[in-house]
Amino acid sequence: MSILDMKFWSLIGLKKKPKARWSKYYSKKEMNIDVPNISIYQFLKNKSIEGNFKDNTALEYFGTKISFTEFFRSIDKCARAFRSQGVRKGDVVTILSANTPEAIISFYALNKIGAVANMVHPLSAENEIKEALQRYSTAMLVAMDITYSKIKNILDETEVYKTIIISARDSMPLFMKIGYEVTQGYKVEKPKKYNKDYMYWNDFIKQGENYTKDKVAEITKRDTPAVILHSGGTTGTPKGIVLSNGNFNAATIQAQTVMNMVTREDSVLAIMPIFHGFGLSVSINDVLSFGAKVVLIPTFKASEFDKLLTKHKPSILVGVPTLFEALTTNERMKDVNLSNIKYVVSGGDTLSKARITKINEFLHNHGANANLLQGYGMTEAVAAVCLDQPVASRPGTIGIPFPSNYIKIVKPGTDEEVGIDEDGELCICGPTVMLGYYNNEKETNEALHIHKDGNVWLHSGDIASMDKDGYITYKQRLKRMIVTSGYNVYPSQIEEVIEKHEAVVDCSVIGVPHPYKVEVAKAYIALKAGYKDTPKLREELTELCKKNLAAYSIPKEFEFRKSLPKTMIGKVDFRKLQQENAEARAEERYGKK
């Protein structure tokens, strides 16, 4: 069944406007944004024409600068190339790539022809990639060459009829291409040049140069599916979040309202990955809509942060708490001048008021006239849905909702709103809320609810409170989920993998504090009789995880016990393990009471 035939919720427009305590911070026009009935591609193209920034640099990649004119020309060529290979409106094409020009050009080209981009982490395990290709009936695959060693084993089990191979070197300057090939590229296993199942990027683009069989651009409406991003939800069972053209365009209009000081002279370090809503929407689409420059960083190394800031002098920093921890702990940042920084936005996880103060002091001591603004969002609502305000900042909060977004705090499991400053479940209503989960009506109906006001509300599963002015304070996750460096890690998924080992009888995974990643996974394991904790067993468990899990999901600690604590109904009591772990760490830090 085509994605265009699936049943989705229609979310543009409200039955009745919810109350908004924060409305005084916006104008009446800002509170009622108009989402155009066009594609993401067309919206960005219109912005480039209106703003007349055709000669501005759109993308920079290892010194290669691509102007907006060149960018749109490349998108057009790529769109024709996809058409020449049989891709049509509603087809799903998977992009398995880091932040490269080719991946971004592919995203907009697919959107131009009405196809749907399925964004997948290139470091996903072989089985995860196979499941992503199978589940979404992927017609074509755009994959980095570093993934070939995994995809070559699985493509025969999918519907993929052609794979386009891209490389980190494709858009590098010539001297850097040579250096890359000599130092790294030669190590990467690649398909043969003339393999019918594979095509290299330049050959692919040439296929579309003379394509004139039919029109390339499709008339695409705002409620048409545009992109699939991924979340494991509370259980770790992979779910495809289907976002529409209207979702993305609404998010961009909101960003232009809230971050209205951004101009075509600005630039951002695109460190957040494009397979993440935060990266694709905020760091790429939103920034390009301002006519500003996106500096693509395919692989981020915290130890080289100072070099990136010194070389590129970005005016916008967007990232997860891990990024800003790296900023303040890098010893080589001592003499780096940050006076060019205008906006610093953190999302993906929360920062305490003390940590925000520390980061702000660091920024000010290095010449920046900006404070860190903390936001909150969900991939199910594209990315950020609220943000602390530059002119009315309240550190420690996640700010107020973006214009035309509505947030209310309800008693969990109901649509009954709680009082001012009371804790409850955070619910979201507005034009960025997803169409639904791909081919998963049950999960969709659990996440999206029609409340008494007749509007569709997204239940976040997160606990928060709201003050009298509409500022929201995030408290904790209802979900049993670990966030490591901004990535969602699902304990149940890890447990399922570990319990496949013949020696394991019980397993429970919790998140434990980490100085840079915020949290990492720790696995508690009970072994069957006759098995012992040995280096060989630990190695086998690690290899099992590597084969079946993304790198960021692999536990950093294993602890073996004779048995694991149980609840009254016989389930492993992970909360007890969390408590024990917290007490042990406190004891290490402060000594026994």
Which stretches of residues belong to each language-model region?
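Gly/Ser/Thr-rich phosphate-binding loop
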Residues: 314-319, 328-395, 406
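Conserved structural elements of the adenylate-forming
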Residues: 72-77, 205-211, 222, 241-261, ...
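AMP-binding/adenylate-forming catalytic domain of the ANL superfamily
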Residues: 166, 547-572, 590-593
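Conserved pre-ATP/AMP-binding loop-to-beta segment of ANL
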Residues: 189-230, 237, 260-267
